[in-house]
Amino acid sequence: LTIARKAGIPVTSRGAGTSVAGNAIGPGLVIDFSRHMNKILDINPEARTARVQPGVIMADLQVACAPFGLWFGPDPSTKNRATLGGMIGNNACGPHALTYGRTSDNTVSLDVIDGRGRRFTAGRDLDQVPGLTDLVSTHLSLLRTELGRFTRQESGYSLEHLLPEKGSDLAKALVGSEGTCVTVVEATVTLKPLPTRPVLVVLGYPTMVAAASDVVNLLPVEPLALEGMDSRLVDVVRRAVGTVPELPGGDGWLFCEVGEDEGDPRSAVERAADLVAASACVDHRVVEDASEAAALWRIRADGVGLAGRTPAGNQAWPGWEDAAVPPANLGPYLTDFEALMAKYGIEGLPYGHFGDGCVHVRMDVPLSEEGDIPVFKAFMEEAAALVGRYGGSISGEHGDGRARGALLPHMY
């Protein structure tokens, strides 16, 4: 880093390269932390923390923590290869972020090197960076009203964590900055107790929009995960693997996982009953058996991979694959987003972390001809404007990267 700074060479930090928005590529020097800085330095079961280097693979940390009955809550689908450094860069999460939060919510401190070559520990203190306290005091109103409006406001910088009522937490503010502010060389993260005896509740609805519109009624029950999909994704999985487990009646579904929490007397089965009672579903299925639940979750897992092609067999691309809106706006947003895809003749398979308002989709945008690129750009601009109208975030999970950075004016 010293040599790169003196020579004026740009530096890009890279983990496993699992991001899909061009987050880990750039000119100059690309540092692959997975090669040499990949060690778990300490696990403290009493404090429920782990100290790691940025190249540690997420799944390896989970294996190391399991004997203590602990785990790192954010669990992206790429956890068997994604690194903690990459997760810090993108503020990664996953289906259980509804309960355990994003990477920023589970970060205690970061050992970093900034652009001037200063190495320091970023935590709950703004004094490490000259001028940071003045920046916050000068822009208090802006930070309070524009940032941190809902849990998946991933796009841009998370400077709301610098506010005094947020603990003046520089570490959390740096999470999600995609390596543009500092280089992380070590991180201390929070660990949580492993969930015990989870129960899966599958709720059936007439449409996916109806399922999405019911999310706000289910959140008070505090499910561990709340995922949404419809028959299009299920049909793709069925055609690929031959069969899928029986689902409740309907054309759209919510997969809800409930468990037992410390200090809460309710059992997972009682929580499941509460969830069904709170819903507006037309049918439901409560699954206590772990193997049956795993088979149902497999629909979601297989669908993620198979969504790379549409039912017609066309290549489906990322680029606009993880926008998010406040959960209360999810149903209307999905209606308008489907209409926008239809306007451009685009086919896709929406699904996602509906409990957080995050929608994943890959679309069969034509990109083989020279004239296709302006059409795709026009779609992206309209999609970003749509998210902005619903108070959402251009990215709810994967970060902005090169794919979406230019769209930020639709939000800010």
Language model: regions and residue ranges:
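Cyclic nucleotide signaling catalytic output domains
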Residues: 411-412
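Beta-rich nucleic-acid/ligand-interaction surfaces
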Residues: 80-85, 233, 237
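C-terminal substrate-recognition/cap domain of FAD-linked oxidoreductases
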Residues: 163-167, 171-378, 384-386, 390-393, ...
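Solvent-exposed alpha-helices and their adjacent loops that cap or buttress functional pockets
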Residues: 13, 22-25, 32, 40-45, ...
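N-terminal glycine-rich flavin-associated loop
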Residues: 1-11, 29, 33-76, 88, ...
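Phosphate/pyrophosphate- and phosphate-bearing ligand-binding catalytic cores of soluble enzymes
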Residues: 120-167
